[in-house]
Amino acid sequence: MNFNIKSLPERKKKPRDVGLTMVIDKGSSIQQCKDLIESSSQFFDVIKFGWTTSNFMNNLKKKIKLFKDADIDVYFGGTLFEAFAIRNQFEDYISILKDYNLSLAEVSDGSISIPHKKKCEYIEKLSKHVTVFSEIGSKDEKKIIPPYKWIRQMRAELNAGSTKVIGEARESGNVGLFRSSGEVRQGLVEEILTEIPTEKIIWEAPLKAQQVWFVKLIGPNVNLGNISGNEVISLETIRVGLRGDTFNEFI
């Protein structure tokens, strides 16, 4: 920070396991990536190339190297995993991760329907090669998963080898953890937190109101994902009570 402002909440320093900010990239250029790193690299930890966008990006290896050289981890969106898995190309997917020198991968089932046991088998196999994040929740806003099932699946996926479980929201913030209006399913989140350690969860929260809600509930070191690159610094101000929405939380 540029100024000495007293009594701000403590933020974990990078590299960190909690207080993560995960940025979503939907097709930025090399120059845009350089600009993001220059302006904000100290405030985010990992970047996801959303859904299957990595299949269409120019200079993909160069983009990955840019972020890794800035100590920012990179992974492909879970939908890319699903695209390979549903076509019985799981081994091809592993080969791609190796070819692109990725140490992190996401396993999800938001667009495909597979038995949860099979999903956990994928997690177990993949965790032998890379660190695994796994995503819970459907991309279909009409599909409401009850809290007990979220908890059961999160626990099973962590036991299978996931390092973190991700609460689905999409980049729009209106499915999974949230109602179609973007409002948080508060009872769901609170019930999950009675059973699953908060440091094991990344909450997708692309909208400011959602970010504010999670910071107020869990604190400045809540793990948040699907953050737009141009909102990284904005989120950091929310985390430490230097934006109006959380200004009085940490005085």
Model features per residue range: what roles?
Residues 31, 54-67, 83-92, 110-130, ...:
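Active-site-adjacent beta->alpha loops and helix N-cap segments on the catalytic face
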